Amino acid sequence: GEGWTKHVVEGLLDDVTQDGKVYGMPYAIEGYGFVYNKDIFEAAGIDASKLKTYDEIDKAFGELKSKIDKGELKDKFPALEAVLEFPVKEKWVTGLHTGNIALGQEFDSNKQAYESKTLDFKYASQLKDLIDLQVKYTKHANNPAALNAVDYSMSVGGGLAIGRVAAVQQGNWIYPEVKEVDQKLADRLGMIPIPLKGVSEGNI
């Protein structure tokens, strides 16, 4: 066998192994969650590094929204208008990433999902809660249809990177774009796990 396989994290090769033979090699790992501006959360008195569950995140986002709405952070963050931006126009964000959080819990592995003849969509209700959570903390909370026009560049380069929003559902791949806009801000980004309420919480 291949010598490198003994150095791989347990379980990582399950989906590319059949009849004891490994047919694939991992070459990159990406993480996604709520990428957030540490300075904004700290200024609001919120330790985002401790946020894991749906309820904790909802409460913290609610506290931050209240401070934004009252103008308490305006002096330090003049462009800040909302907790989140939700790029609904990007189907890979809503369909692939957000959807996978719910669908991934239905199967023990990618292989099992591939071979399955049915999809029960057991966690549809929790997925709706997750989507509603994100909508609730955008500037379009009262007009969700407007989110259909929000794309990647509006949420990252024109959102998080300029301090217009405090967080966005994205992954570690946004760092170079944020760095191009604001190096200091890019170096102060963190990631909060995206929770599937009562099912999978605290995972990136």
Language-model regions, residue ranges each:
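Extracytoplasmic "Venus flytrap"/periplasmic binding protein-like
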Residues: 1-10, 15-17, 39-45, 52, ...
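Hinge/lid segment of periplasmic solute-binding proteins
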Residues: 1-31, 75-78, 97
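Short glycine- and hydrophobic/aromatic-rich loop-to-beta-strand nucleating segment
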Residues: 32-36
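Extracytoplasmic/periplasmic substrate-recognition and gating elements
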Residues: 42-44, 181-204
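A local structural motif
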Residues: 45-48, 135-151, 164, 182-188
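Short helix-initiation/N-cap motifs at beta->coil->alpha
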Residues: 52-58, 146-161
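Glycine-centered hinge/linker elements that transmit conformational signals in sensory
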Residues: 61-62, 113-149, 194
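Beta->alpha turn/N-cap motifs
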Residues: 170-178
